[in-house]
Amino acid sequence: MSRSVQMFSILLAVLPGIAATAQAGGPKPPAGFRAIFNGKDLTGWYGLNPHSSANLKGEKKHANLKQQRADFPKHWKIDNDELVNDGTGPYATTEAEFGDIELRLEYKTVPKADSGIYLRGTPQVQIWDWHQKFDPKNPNRKPHLGSGGLFNNTPGSPGRDPAVLADKPFGEWNQFRIRQIGARTWVWLNAKLVVDGAVMENYWERSKPLPANGPIMLQTHGGEIRWRNLFVHEIGADEAKTILNAAETEAKAKLSKALTLHASFDKGLDADFSRGDKKCYVQQGQALVHAKPNEEVKFAADAGRFGGALHFPKKGTYRPSFKDGGVLGYNAKSWSASVSAWLRLNPDQDLEPGYCDPIQIIGNDNKKGYIFLEWSKDETPRYFRYAIRPLFPIWNPNNLQWADIPNDKKPMVQVARAPFSREKWTHVVFTVENINDKKNPPVGKLYLNGKLQGAIEKWDMTFGWDPAKVLLVLGASYVGHMDDLAVFDRPLTDIEVERIHELKNGIRELYSSSSGDR
C-alpha cells in the first residue's frame, strides 16, 4: 500500500479530540478549527426555516424572514454551554456562509424526535430516533438504519442511507465529523464512517450542482435536541485537491483488495486476473473443459465497452463458466460477494422466446440454491430480474412453477423498464450478503448504471451447495454482448458501485497501474 493510502487510512480512523464534557471558559476548538457557537449566547446565529419561506415573494417573504428572526430566541436557549432547541421553531442558522469545510459537533436528542444538519443551506445530514420501526408503507424512510445519511438525496442513491448503525443510546452525546469538498461528502458518526464521499444533491434545484457556499443550519423537528462543541475548519483549494486525490487512491485500493476475478474479454474468454483459476471452462458431460470461442460465443475485438467483448449471436447451449475456487468464496457459514458486468442488447428484439439468464451462480443442485439475472419470458417489454433462490422448500413450499408464483412472493428484484439497448452499454452489479449466516440478516442488491434498483430482504437464505461444485456461468440463452466481468469478495457499497461504473478504462484500473496484471 502506498504512503498516501496509509496516511489517508490513518486519517479516516482517527477522530481527533472533541471535548467529552463542557469545559470552563467555553468551547475549545482543536488546532486548525474555530468555534461557530461561543457557548454563551446566540451571537453569529439567526432563525430560518427555508421551507416556510421558499414559495413566498416580495413583502410576504420579507415579513416571514423577519418573524423567523424574532421567533428564534423563543425556541433556542443556552444551557451549560449547550445550544438547546425545544423541538419547534426556525432552524439555527449561521450568519456566516461556508464552502469546503470539515465540521465537528456533538448532539444529544430524545425519543420520537429527529433533526438534521444543513450544509450550504441544503438538507441534510440526517439525525434519527433509530428505535423507530421500518414502515413498508413508507419504504424510503429508514430510521432504523441510523443517523448520518444524506436523507434528501434521491432514494437508492449513494449516501442516502448510512453504511452502518452508529448512534449511541438516548442520554449519551453523539459526535459528528462531516467533511464536504464540492458536493462530495464524508460523514463519521461516533468515529464510524457512515457516508463515504457520496455526492450531496441540490435539494432545491436537483438539476443544478450544490451551491458553492451557504450557511450551516441545525434543524428543529419534534423534540428537544442539544448541541455543543461546534467547530469548523475551512478547506482551501490545495488541501481539497490533496484530500480528494488521497480519497480516490484509498477507494481504489479497497476495491483492488476485494477483487477476486477480472475478465476483460480483450483477448479471449480467460480471465486477466484471478485469485483462483484464470481459465474459462464449459461443461461437456460430467467434465469441465477449457472454453474457446466458437459460433455460439464469439470474441469481438474492439466491440466492447473497454476493448474487446464476448458476443452471443444466438440462443445456444455453450455457456462459458469460471470455477469458484478463490473467486466467489462460497461457504456454508457466511458468504458475501459482488458480481459486475456490462451488457449490450435490445431484450425485446434480440432475445429468443423463453427465459434468458445472462449470468448465473450455480452449485451441484439448483434445488439447493440458485442465483441468477434473468429477463422474463412473457412480458413486453421484458422485465429484468435478479433472484436468489435458497433451498427449494424455503422459496417454493407449494412446488409451483417459477412463473406461477406471484412476483411479490419471489425472492427477487424486478425492474419493469431497465435501460438496455443495442446502442449503449448497461452496467449491472448484483451482491449477495450473509448467505447461510445464522446471526446477520441476508441481503441481495441489484444495481443498474451505478444506481440501486432494489434489494432482496427478509428471506431465509440457507443454501446447501457443495463448495467444490460452484460455478459462475455466462450466457444462458443470452443473445447480445458482454464485457468487463468482475467478482469481489464482499458486497460493494452504493458509492463503490458508482465508482466502478465511472471507471474510464474499466476494472483494469484497480490493479494494472500499480502491480501489473496479477
Where do the language-model regions lie?
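Positively charged n-region of N-terminal signal peptides that target proteins for export
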Residues: 1-7
